[in-house]
Amino acid sequence: MNPFLKLVRIHNVIGAGLGAFTGYVASSMWKIDPTELILAVLVVALVDAGGNAINDVYDVEIDRINKPDRPIPSGAVSLRTATSLSYGLMGVGVILSALQGYLQFLVALLTSVALIFYARDLKRTGIYGNLVVATATALSLFYGGLSYHEGDWLQRIWIPVLYTFLLTLSREIVKGIEDYRGDLANHVNTLATTRGIASAWRVARVALIITEVTSPLPLFLGYNILYGIVLVPFLYITTKAVLAETSEEGASKARSLLKGSAFLGMVAFALGSLPFQFLFHYLP
């Protein structure tokens, strides 16, 4: 893979862009303004790419030991280039957000600042770092909805934003459990290293169960039957994550499952937002 694509974690960038797309179509019910949608996806993708790059900048010393094949420690990308690229990407994203409005600009700016502080200070603070990542990820969908910003957009977007927050929070806690031994050796404070694996698992499971129990709610708030159809595999995969073994190995399995849950969640809200007249038009 190209070292710059690896540096920005291109798969995460694509996921963030899809989040913005989902947020826009969910809040607008597919009443798409192509310019606003493209800007929303670009802003979110650029800010996410910059945040991922700055994360590697501040992790360079740890990566020299744990992940020497990452672009900076391997020498494929210099530290100076990576730093300039990260700030440049976030800067372009923030500038583009100003074209959409002051609220969009404010969200993009604050998210960029939060990602910098996360990489520099908050990543090793345990639950606080997890909360920052979960909030930033949920804001991808929120930003998409904000880019539409008409009618009852907020009523339609708050549930997918909340579910994204809870799923991401669970995944970040589970990732801390998976990395327990390495984090303990490197004095990294995570929920698992400070409170124990069992306690960390308990918090992650509570967040997932809240998501599962309330997941039918969108069907009563205007989302169509396609949401319910996609909800079935979502619940199956998420339940498997909840029931994973309370161990580092179980955490590794759960983290992979939760990536699938996140993707299915976006699909559910995107398809569930299609207006009925659109669905009936394509029925035989």
From Swiss-Prot:
This is Digeranylgeranylglyceryl phosphate synthase. InterPro entries: DGGGP_synth, Prenyltransferase_related, UbiA_prenyltransferase, UbiA_sf. Pathway: Membrane lipid metabolism; glycerophospholipid metabolism. The chain crosses the membrane at residues 10-30, 37-57, 76-98, 102-119, 126-146, 217-237, 260-280. CDD domains: PT_UbiA_DGGGPS. Its cofactor is Mg(2+). It comes from Metallosphaera sedula (strain ATCC 51363 / DSM 5348 / JCM 9185 / NBRC 15509 / TH2). GO terms for molecular function: geranylgeranylglycerol-phosphate geranylgeranyltransferase activity; magnesium ion binding. The keyword tRNA processing does not apply. It catalyses: sn-3-O-(geranylgeranyl)glycerol 1-phosphate + (2E,6E,10E)-geranylgeranyl diphosphate = 2,3-bis-O-(geranylgeranyl)-sn-glycerol 1-phosphate + diphosphate. Keywords: Cell membrane, Lipid biosynthesis, Lipid metabolism, Magnesium, Membrane, Phospholipid biosynthesis, Phospholipid metabolism, Transferase, Transmembrane, Transmembrane helix. One of its GO terms (cellular component) is plasma membrane. Pfam families: UbiA. Belongs to the UbiA prenyltransferase family. DGGGP synthase subfamily. Its main location: membrane. Its EC number is 2.5.1.42. It is a multi-pass membrane protein.
